[in-house]
Amino acid sequence: MSPLPTLLVIAKEPRPGRVKTRLTPPFTPQKAAALAEAALADTLDTVARTPAHRRVLVLEGEPGPWLPPGFEVVRQCPGGLDERLAAAFAHCDGPALLIGMDTPQVTPELLGVDFADCDAYFGPAEDGGFWALGLADPDPALLLGVPMSTPRTGAVQRARLAGLRVRDLPRLRDVDTAYDAELVAGTAPGGRFATELARLTEAGR
C-alpha cells in the first residue's frame, strides 16, 4: 500500500452571482448559491471521512461555516483554470488527488485511491471534462495548457497522461444545469445537496 494521498478540493466561495450561474434560470442567483454551498458541504464532508495524508481546500474567496475541521485552506492563484489546477498540485509533496465542488455524489470509496501500482487516476465527467485527477508524483506541467470547460477537456487531459500507468475512475455527472442537479440529487438522496434541491423546488411551486 502506498502512502496516503493529499486530497485537494478546488472551489469557489458560494456567493450569489459568482457560482453556478448556469442554474439561473430557473433558479435565482441566491438559490443557485445555496445549491453550490450544499454541494460543497457534501464534498468536504466526504473528503473529511476519507483517509488522507492532508486535506487541502484551494479556495477562491473566503471560508464559511460550511468548512469542517481538519482542512488547510490555501488561496487559488490568479490565471486560467489550468494554471489554478496546476498550482493546486504544487502544494503537494507526495501523491495527491484533486476534485472540484460539482460532484456532491462522491463517496469515500471513490476517493480512497492507492498509488501502489499506478501513477495516475482519472475521473471522466459526463460533459466531456473530468471530475478527478490523481498523480503519484504531482507535475503541474501535466495540466498547463489544457483547454478547460470544453467538451474536449477530458480527452486532452487524459492524453497528457500518456506513458503513465493510469486507473480510470467511474464517470460522474457534474452539476452544471438544473437537469444535472436533478439527476445528481437522485444518486445521493440523503445528502445536503438533494435536501436543498428538494426544499428549493418545493418553495418555488
Q: Could you say what each language-model-derived stretch is?
A:
Residues L135-L161:
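Short, glycine-/small-residue-rich phosphate/pyrophosphate-handling segment
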Residues A34-H53:
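A short, N-terminal amphipathic alpha-helix
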Residues I10-R15, G61, E126-D127:
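Short glycine-enriched loops at secondary-structure junctions
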Residues L67-L97, T150-T153:
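Short phosphate-binding loop-to-helix
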Residues V156-R205:
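Conserved alpha/beta core of the MobA/IspD/sugar-nucleotide pyrophosphorylase nucleotidyltransferase superfamily
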Residues P104-F130:
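Conserved donor-nucleotide/metal-binding helix-loop-beta segment in metal-dependent transferases, i.e.
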